[in-house]
Regions:
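Charged, alpha-helix-forming regions
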Residues: 1-110, 114-126, 132-193
């Protein structure tokens, strides 16, 4: 099970993680939540229906990683499609941000509980329910997209990542990117089996 998710009876998934892996995953999930931002909290006396239909931003984010996490709905440069993308963003981005934040928070909470349970043991087996597994899958995907954007990874140079010299300053993030990819792939395989 080391480093690969496996099925749990009744659904869900499990993976063995050591203390370093737990620390890295937690740190990355917290950084992702910080990147996504805190979100808008409705006023205590606000109309719940109005809060449900609150409008979000209409312009794409300037940060390339956020732009990757929250892309335009339509990729064409025509004025009509830019306006449609703006409207789509206005009505969907807040909910999408909230879901991505919640997925990352599920990761942090699971790792915090795991760390508390395994104190002093050097690692533990993380067991996820089916719902937690889906949240983890979303968070792992968001982490890979973010790191891949920061590293400027393209399909064409994917193989080159495996051959970076140890002296390359990108090497630690590339290793995290590749490891997250392997975790994500094993979780997908587990959930589909």
């Amino acid at each position: 099970m080391a480093g690969r998710f496996e099925n749990l009876p009744g659904g869900g998934a499990a993976v063995a993680l050591d203390d370093v892996e737990i620390s890295i995953l937690r740190s990355l999930a917290v950084q992702l939540m910080e990147l996504i931002g805190p979100g808008e909290e409705p006023a205590k006396d606000a109309d719940p229906l109005a809060a449900l239909f609150a409008e979000g931003p209409s312009k794409p984010p300037s940060d390339p990683a956020l732009k990757r996490l929250f892309p335009d709905a339509y990729g064409d440069d025509s004025e009509e499609l830019r306006a449609a993308a703006s409207d789509f963003r206005r009505y969907t981005e807040n909910d999408l941000r909230a879901r991505k934040r919640e997925d990352a928070l599920v990761v942090v909470r699971a790792l915090d509980a795991l760390s508390a349970d395994a104190a002093g043991e050097g690692g533990a087996v993380l067991k996820l329910t089916p719902d937690e597994s889906r949240a983890w899958l979303g968070a792992l995907n968001d982490l890979r997209l973010t790191i891949g954007t920061r590293l400027e990874v393209t399909d064409e140079e994917g193989e080159q990542l495996y051959r970076l010299p140890d002296s390359d300053p990108r090497k630690p993030m590339v290793m995290a990117y590749l490891w997250l990819g392997a975790l994500q792939e094993s979780l997908v395989e587990t959930l589909m089996s």
